[in-house]
């Protein structure tokens, strides 16, 4: 059976202006984030050569513990690790709470794609894997 294609417009990535290595205390307004890639590798230290501790999935709400060019984050099941600054979207507590309350789609297929528009020939926005959480934006035909 052909897997139905998911449709969602993903939020824009917020890119930090901070230079790598600069230490920043995390304010209450930026102590939260949402994972914005399908699978996010969490590491022992803030560098790509460091060992991987666990993984987080797209749409997972996390707490930001500190920032040093990489974010140290904590998952809802209390795992901690370091992630590159581009794989999470930092946000205020209010926006974080809104995300948690919003209706979601949970990906159950092993693998799939999100598209820019509800059309199989539209530009691919991202891959998705089982367990990814996307904010419900409505449906059109067999696109969500």
What are these regions, as identified by a protein language model?
Residues 1-28:
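Bacterial Sec-dependent N-terminal signal peptides
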Residues 21-31, 37, 47, 54, ...:
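Boundary regions of SH3-family modules and the immediately adjacent low-complexity/disordered segments
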